[in-house]
């Protein structure tokens, strides 16, 4: 959520910044128009309340009953007008809030300009893609041949874009989650295990609403929402709190399944497990002082890259351009791993600084020093990593000519002695 004071005091700067992402300046003008209405109504309400207070004091001193009754009737009309204005004010404030929540975050000045993902900039690449002496298979062929991915039964259970992991495939998924959580603990993140359903207020605080409403699953009867990412519950751990400066930075990691309707991806990536309605992810999340947030973004990126490195996966890091930047982000790095069976790079982590955009919506503040006025924290989030794309990359990079898949060394302690997945 953007700062209304910034919009009010520097509208041209806000329009120019949002214009880099394709936002129509009329959206900013709408917020300003509601803001002026709201302030005009507030002025009128305050003037009438001041008048009522002054006249009330006069009435107490009046000896003429007729004159006093006339003043009382006059003030009753003033009270009715105040009540009417309060209703108008509430409606305008609701409209202004809705317009404000439609505005995305401002991109950082350093973010490269560009209309779409083709303008993203590769800033790092590590690990040489493996050279095969056979034609590598895509993961869906490997998974079915090894009997570790069952697409048919996934569809039978839940419909399209669902699947079942079996035997060592299910164990490999679990091993990845446990290993990632252990790794991030060593990197300085405190593990939390949160609910997978949240109140609507949490969706607003994490800025999933209103933009992504059509992509979310909701229980209408109880007004609870399935989480699309652990970012949602973890953001709201400190909603409506004032943190002490010495608590910061707070760094968390969390595993959750993620639920997305994928309406915006209809017809894309229909084969395999690359894009599903339910998938697992380990998330890294930070609450930090504003002056340190871009240093923390570099740590977040380094920690995600280290995860890929330890798994032995070739990866590259991109900085996203303005046209591909997420709604809440000011700056984002995407980390992609090579999938030789499909011949493409797969995004497994997106590391973003959202500055105070979520904190302002969720009212998360900190006190820079004892007695100081509270300020909004900055928040950052990054996948560490997303599954099943990490699973895809392991299957395709570690496949052997006989169709078996070697388990990465770091995962073997979590695999109960399994070092190679073979068809049994």
From Swiss-Prot:
L-serine binds at residues 229-231, 283, 383. Coiled coil: none annotated. Keywords: Aminoacyl-tRNA synthetase, ATP-binding, Cytoplasm, Ligase, Nucleotide-binding, Protein biosynthesis. ATP binds at residues 260-262, 347-350. It comes from the Bacteria. It is found in: Cytoplasm. It catalyses: tRNA(Ser) + L-serine + ATP = L-seryl-tRNA(Ser) + AMP + diphosphate + H(+); tRNA(Sec) + L-serine + ATP = L-seryl-tRNA(Sec) + AMP + diphosphate + H(+). GO terms for molecular function: ATP binding; serine-tRNA ligase activity. GO terms for biological process: selenocysteine biosynthetic process; seryl-tRNA aminoacylation. Disulfide bonds: none annotated. Pathway: Aminoacyl-tRNA biosynthesis; selenocysteinyl-tRNA(Sec) biosynthesis; L-seryl-tRNA(Sec) from L-serine and tRNA(Sec): step 1/1. Its EC number is 6.1.1.11. Its main location: cytoplasm. Pfam families: Seryl_tRNA_N (PF02403), tRNA-synt_2b (PF00587). SUPFAM superfamilies: Class II aaRS and biotin synthetases, tRNA-binding arm. HAMAP family: Ser_tRNA_synth_type1 (MF_00176). Catalyzes the attachment of serine to tRNA(Ser). Is also able to aminoacylate tRNA(Sec) with serine, to form the misacylated tRNA L-seryl-tRNA(Sec), which will be further converted into selenocysteinyl-tRNA(Sec). Belongs to the class-II aminoacyl-tRNA synthetase family. Type-1 seryl-tRNA synthetase subfamily. Homodimer. The tRNA molecule binds across the dimer. This is Serine--tRNA ligase.
């Amino acid at each position: 959520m953007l700062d209304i004071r910034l919009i009010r005091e520097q509208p041209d700067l806000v329009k120019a910044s949002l214009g880099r992402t394709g936002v129509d300046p009329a959206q900013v003008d709408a917020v300003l128009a509601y803001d002026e209405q709201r302030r005009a109504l507030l002025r009128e309400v305050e003037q009438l309340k001041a008048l009522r207070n002054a006249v009330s004091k006069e009435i107490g001193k009046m000896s003429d009953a007729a004159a006093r009754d006339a003043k009382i009737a006059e003030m009753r009309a003033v009270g009715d007008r105040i009540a009417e204005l309060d209703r108008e004010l509430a409606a305008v404030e609701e409209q202004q809030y809705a317009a404000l929540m439609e505005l995305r975050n401002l991109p950082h000045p350093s973010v490269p300009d560009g209309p779409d993902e083709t303008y993203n900039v590769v800033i790092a690449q590590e690990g040489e893609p493996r050279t095969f002496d056979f034609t590598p298979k895509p993961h869906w062929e490997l998974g079915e041949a090894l009997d570790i991915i069952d697409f048919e039964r996934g569809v039978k259970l839940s419909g399209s874009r669902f699947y079942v992991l079996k035997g060592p495939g299910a164990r490999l998924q679990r091993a990845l989650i446990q290993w990632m959580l252990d790794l991030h603990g060593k990197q300085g993140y405190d593990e939390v295990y949160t609910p997978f359903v949240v109140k609507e207020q949490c969706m607003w605080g994490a800025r999933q609403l209103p933009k992504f409403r059509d992509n979310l699953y909701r229980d209408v009867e109880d007004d609870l929402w399935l989480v699309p990412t652990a970012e949602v519950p973890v953001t709201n751990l400190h909603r409506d709190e004032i943190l002490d400066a010495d608590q910061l930075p707070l760094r968390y990691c969390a595993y959750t399944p993620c639920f997305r309707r994928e309406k915006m991806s209809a017809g894309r990536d229909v084969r395999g497990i690359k894009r599903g309605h339910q998938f697992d992810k380990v998330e890294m999340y930070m609450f930090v002082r504003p002056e340190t947030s871009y240093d923390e973004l570099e740590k977040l990126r380094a920690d995600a890259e280290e995860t890929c490195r330890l798994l032995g996966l070739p990866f590259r890091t991109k900085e996203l351009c303005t046209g591909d930047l997420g709604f809440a982000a000011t700056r984002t790095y995407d980390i992609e791993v090579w999938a030789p069976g499909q011949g493409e790079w797969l995004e497994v982590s997106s590391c973003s600084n959202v500055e105070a955009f979520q904190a302002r919506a969720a009212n998360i503040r900190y006190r820079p020093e004892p007695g100081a006025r509270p300020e909004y924290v900055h928040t950052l989030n990054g996948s560490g990593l997303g599954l099943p794309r990490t699973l895809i990359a392991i299957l395709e990079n570690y496949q052997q000519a006989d169709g078996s898949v070697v388990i990465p060394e770091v995962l073997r302690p979590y695999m109960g002695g399994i070092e190679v997945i073979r068809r049994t």
